[in-house]
């Protein structure tokens, strides 16, 4: 849809412009934005198929966002997707959500929650990232030990 393409074009500018007063952090390269946009399109397609929600970035303003993201992550895990990939998907959704929070009028219901849907989305990302971190921690410790004693 043209409206969604326009929203995603605005997201691209938001993330890639070297100077942007609304954005925390530095700009990113086009490939990063492309990944975020592809992830968002997959998520919006899943929302349309499972909840009959019209695709658009406005869903990121909704109080139910983190519930939908959790269901989506579980669906991806059930399909056998690795947690590292799910963490990347959730990170892309979190980046788009941050853009929406900076540039859209977020639902009052979402803002009144003890933790915002964005906060909960970031928690989900950390939870699927944690198993990978636990798996790699011994290896990273061994690499650090070797590097430390090699000096």
Model-derived regions: residue spans:
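Charge-rich, intrinsically disordered N-terminal extensions
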Residues: 1-151
